[in-house]
């Protein structure tokens, strides 16, 4: 098997064994092929066999990812496949010149409606039922309906009864005008059948079948048995296609202790055409998460808002609906209702959510396994701690610590440390790293707490050496692995290794390290922004100092302690202000420094 398919092959082993559709994507996230299966895992596995056709080999050379959508039955998978292929027109799927689609049953909107098979939808108020995959079964049921119910077949009026009237298959509405009420009852019965309410007709068919057997008319009995089976199959509610509905999204949130999967099943013209899954690590309850997600998701710039948004958790929707409709100039509705149809769609959403969460965890596990091998670790890096140093022009230096468990942020483990070993104005990242590593791991050792599996330092060889020297001093260099990740080149450095490790962009192992590094960087910058904002806002409390001038004081003079090192003349010269204002700034800084207006966790 080609090396670039190894990760896909592992993913296939974890696919569900239920029915559904699979989508094969290129490196550029373009859908190359869409297929359906009774057993997704078994079907997709076939693409990884040694003996596959030349065309399949060409396809698999271009496949970078595989996604699946589970369904409740093989029948629904077939309909979904049809809908998806029509929507996306993948390069490797068959392109039919005569893309006539599957047949439907149409009940016209005429005074005396006709009931017939069609493959085309006309928006004239007619009712459509289907589509149906097996045209033969559809023909059998239509034949049964035509023989059981005396419906109109003729397109035009006639002065004389038609052949169907003489055969007992028509009431004669083509030439009579007094049968509207009777005819309406016949059509209502047909609607009941097509909506799955067929028990009475099934009973009648069963009686006729038994009578045929008694008469030893086995040919008729076999035909009646086929009709009965076809009737049951065609009347089953198909949740993949909803011909009499407008476009709609169904949103389901599946929550676990550490992660939420938000599944959006998108229907277009009544057909399921897309599955969108978002992962969320927030700690909101389901109702609050539902409200926040809908607001953010549908107010995004390029998001197309459907006619209806169905949710499975009852929330207050009035303000959210108003906001979406005003911002997007739409008339959407947010609906929470429990019907037979929505329950079935929810079951499909739950299935896809569980698969997505399992796949997400499996992807993380594979990435951690890859990282373990790359760093030559003896165990999986289940717990990673990342560090970053930040300061304000050499002042207020802090170190941020972020913790990741199984590749996901563990926010209870986050810390921010005030660095005490540096003088005001002193910039020394190596010294800061030594201090924070010493403080962090001395505490863990003294309190007999578990060490992380991996420590990540934001920086290069110098920062790595500083951290490693402290670990050696604590005699834990063999108990925990430490590495550094340089920002620009994205090169991984390890102790006692002269050459760094350069991984390809998009490598899952590299992405885990980048996530840890970026989160540590974000945390440090976030703290410093808060600190900077507090200082700036405090400067603006000086009489005569506005927002812009307060910002300029911070930029030009620095923090309170920096200002204490200057006299009034120096302040006036640097800020280009008079002595009176310089004295105010100096006095204010002295007062604020005494209050010690900032605080840091340690």
From Swiss-Prot:
Q: Which InterPro entries match?
A: GIY-YIG_endonuc, GIY-YIG_endonuc_sf, GIY-YIG_UvrC_Cho, RuvA_2-like, UVR_dom, UVR_dom_sf, UvrABC_protein_C, UvrC
Q: Which Gene3D superfamilies match?
A: 5' to 3' exonuclease, C-terminal subdomain, GIY-YIG endonuclease, UvrC, RNAse H endonuclease domain
* Superkingdom in the source lineage: Bacteria
Concerning PROSITE patterns, the annotation shows: GIY_YIG (PS50164), UVRC (PS50165)
Q: Could you say which protein family the record assigns here?
A: Belongs to the UvrC family.
The record's GO molecular-function terms, alphabetically, read: DNA binding; excinuclease ABC activity
Q: How does it assemble?
A: Interacts with UvrB in an incision complex.
Q: Which GO terms describe its biological process?
A: nucleotide-excision repair; SOS response
Q: Where in the cell is it found?
A: Cytoplasm
Q: What is this protein called?
A: UvrABC system protein C
UniProt keyword list: Cytoplasm, DNA damage, DNA excision, DNA repair, Excision nuclease, SOS response
Q: What does this protein do?
A: The UvrABC repair system catalyzes the recognition and processing of DNA lesions. UvrC both incises the 5' and 3' sides of the lesion. The N-terminal half is responsible for the 3' incision and the C-terminal half is responsible for the 5' incision.
Can you supply one Gene Ontology CC term for this chain's record?
excinuclease repair complex
Q: Where is the GIY-YIG domain?
A: 17-94
| Pfam families assigned to the protein according to its UniProt record, in alphabetical order | GIY-YIG, UVR, UvrC_RNaseH, UvrC_RNaseH_dom
Supply the NCBIfam families for this chain: PRK14670.1 (NF011264), uvrC (TIGR00194)
UVR domain boundaries: 199-234
Please state the gene responsible for encoding this protein.
Answer: uvrC
């Amino acid at each position: 098997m080609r090396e670039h398919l190894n990760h896909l092959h592992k993913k296939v082993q974890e696919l569900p064994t239920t029915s559904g559709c699979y989508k094969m994507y290129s490196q550029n996230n373009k859908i190359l092929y869409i297929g359906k299966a009774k057993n997704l895992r078994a079907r997709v596995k076939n693409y990884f066999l040694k003996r596959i056709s030349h065309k399949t080999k060409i396809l698999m050379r271009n496949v970078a990812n595989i996604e699946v959508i589970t369904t409740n039955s093989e029948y629904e998978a077939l309909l979904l496949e049809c809908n998806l292929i029509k929507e996306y027109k993948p390069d490797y799927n068959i392109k039919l010149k005569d893309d006539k689609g599957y047949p439907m049953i149409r009940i016209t909107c005429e005074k005396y409606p006709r009931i017939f098979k069609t493959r085309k939808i006309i928006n004239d108020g007619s009712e459509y039922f289907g589509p149906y995959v097996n045209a033969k079964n559809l023909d059998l049921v239509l034949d049964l309906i035509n023989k059981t119910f005396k419906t109109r077949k003729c397109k035009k009026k006639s002065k004389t009864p038609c052949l169907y009237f003489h055969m007992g298959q028509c009431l004669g509405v083509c030439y009579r005008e007094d049968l509207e009420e009777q005819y309406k009852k016949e059509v209502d019965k047909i609607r009941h059948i097509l909506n799955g309410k067929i028990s009475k007709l099934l009973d009648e068919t069963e009686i006729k079948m038994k009578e045929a057997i008694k008469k030893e008319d086995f040919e008729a009995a076999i035909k009646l048995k086929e009709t009965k089976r076809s009737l049951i199959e065609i009347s089953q509610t198909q949740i993949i296609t909803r011909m009499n509905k407008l476009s709609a999204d169904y949103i389901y949130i599946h929550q676990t202790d550490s992660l939420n999967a938000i599944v959006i099943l998108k229907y277009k013209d009544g057909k399921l055409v897309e599955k969108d899954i978002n992962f969320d690590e927030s700690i909101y309850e389901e109702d609050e998460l539902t409200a926040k997600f809908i607001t953010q998701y549908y107010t995004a710039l390029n998001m197309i808002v459907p006619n209806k948004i169905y949710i499975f958790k009852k929330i207050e929707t009035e303000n959210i609906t108003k906001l979406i409709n005003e911002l997007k100039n739409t008339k959407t509705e947010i609906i929470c209702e429990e019907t037979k149809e929505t329950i079935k769609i929810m079951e499909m959403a739950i299935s896809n959510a569980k698969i997505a969460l399992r796949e997400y965890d499996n992807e993380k596990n594979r990435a951690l396994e890859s990282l373990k091998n790359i760093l030559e670790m003896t165990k999986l890096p289940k717990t990673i701690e990342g560090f970053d140093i930040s300061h304000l022009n050499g002042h207020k230096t802090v170190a941020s610590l972020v913790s990741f468990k199984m590749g996901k942020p563990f926010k209870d483990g986050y810390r921010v440390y005030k660095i005490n070993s540096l003088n005001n104005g002193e910039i020394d990242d190596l010294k800061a790293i030594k201090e924070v590593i010493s403080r962090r791991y001395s505490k863990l050792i003294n309190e007999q707490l578990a060490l992380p599996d991996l420590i990540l330092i934001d920086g290069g060889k110098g920062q790595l050496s500083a951290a490693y020297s402290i670990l050696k001093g604590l005699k834990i260099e063999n108990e925990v692995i430490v590495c550094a990740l340089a920002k620009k080149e994205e090169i991984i450095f390890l102790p006692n290794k002269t050459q760094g490790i350069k991984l390809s962009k998009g490598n899952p192992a590299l992405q885990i390290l980048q996530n840890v590094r970026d989160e540590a960087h974000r945390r440090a910058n976030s703290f410093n922004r808060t600190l900077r904002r507090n200082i700036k806002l405090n400067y603006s409390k000086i009489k005569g100092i506005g927002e812009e001038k307060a910002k300029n004081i911070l930029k030009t003079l620095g923090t309170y302690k920096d200002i204490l090192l200057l006299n009034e003349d120096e302040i006036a010269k640097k800020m280009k202000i008079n002595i009176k204002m310089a004295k105010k700034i100096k006095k204010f800084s002295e007062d604020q420094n005494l209050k010690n207006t900032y605080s840091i966790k340690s």
